[in-house]
Regions:
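Mg2+/Mn2+-dependent nuclease catalytic core
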Residues: 107-206
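A residue-level signal for conserved active-site and pocket-lining positions in enzyme catalytic cores
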Residues: 17, 48-49, 125, 160, ...
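Surface-exposed helix-capping loop/turn segments at secondary-structure junctions
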Residues: 57-63, 166-173, 211-222
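A non-catalytic, helix-rich entry segment at domain boundaries
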Residues: 43-108, 112
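Short amphipathic alpha-helical segments and their helix-coil junctions
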Residues: 1-3, 20-34, 67-72, 136-142, ...
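Nuclease catalytic cores
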Residues: 4, 8-60, 85-86, 104-107
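Accessory terminal regions of nucleic-acid processing enzymes
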Residues: 131, 205-239
């Protein structure tokens, strides 16, 4: 099976369920095939991300609140999701003031790892400090923060760290990656070493070759905790 690029979402999908990977990245099905699907969390997360993307240069909380109001009609989710919105905006506004130079919002990257594969994705925000260090921020609206121990092995953040190090030509230990939880005003951050990233990239190459060796008929469904939220559930042979 042909594959020459890997993204965090592609890797996550493959690890969760091979059949879901087939539907999304082999058959390219983009619709929602789940009559019970609830997209509130996805829509709300996209809404908050868009506020943060467009609001980094705003100088007052009122401007940020007005931006949120202007964007709201573009997203469909239950009004109950908005109960913490004022707190989220206040926390982000104060957090944002403390940050140094924003190099990029929604940074699209594609970085060659070897001659035959690359990694690609979109990073919420990249900050450059006066010392020349970089901070990669991934905004999160999930209820509970990811423990730092899990962040140390998070494939998404490892890819982001490698991409920023390559893009801006700095050592990997000059890049800090972090989840920011605006409802908690909590930043969970880690910094990776060269050896750790090298081990991860070797594992990623092995995963790519695993996928390359598979035929479409090898991609089987896996019943797990994500099934009820899967956009392809009604197509799945397990249901």
């Amino acid at each position: 099976m042909f594959i020459n690029t890997m993204s965090p979402s592609k890797l996550k999908t493959y690890n969760e369920c091979k059949k879901k990977y087939q539907f999304k990245y082999v058959d390219y099905l983009r619709g929602i095939y789940n009559v019970n699907s609830n997209t509130d969390a996805l829509q709300y997360g996209s809404y908050v991300h868009k506020i943060f993307e467009l609001g980094t240069e705003l100088e007052t909380l009122e401007e940020l609140e007005n931006l949120a109001g202007d964007l709201r009609p573009n997203y469909k989710f239950s009004s109950i999701k908005e109960k913490n919105l004022s707190l989220i905006l206040e926390n982000f506004f104060e957090f944002n003031k403390k940050l140094e130079e924003t190099i990029s919002n929604e940074m699209i990257f594609k970085i060659d790892v070897t001659d035959d594969y690359s990694i690609n994705g979109i990073i919420d925000r990249v900050i450059k400090g006066k010392s020349g260090n970089y901070l990669v921020i991934d905004y999160k609206t999930s209820r509970r923060p990811t423990p730092k121990t899990e962040l140390f092995t998070d494939p998404q953040m490892l890819m982001y760290a490698y991409a920023v190090a390559k893009q801006f030509k700095v050592p990997i230990d000059k890049v800090t990656v972090a989840h920011y939880y605006p409802h908690l005003d909590k930043l969970v951050s880690v910094c990776y070493g060269r050896a750790q990233v090298s081990v991860f990239l070797r594992g990623l190459k092995n995963k790519i070759w695993e996928i390359r060796k598979k035929r479409k008929t090898d991609l089987k469904a896996s019943q797990n905790q994500w099934c009820n939220w899967c956009q392809y559930k009604d197509l799945c042979p397990e249901f």
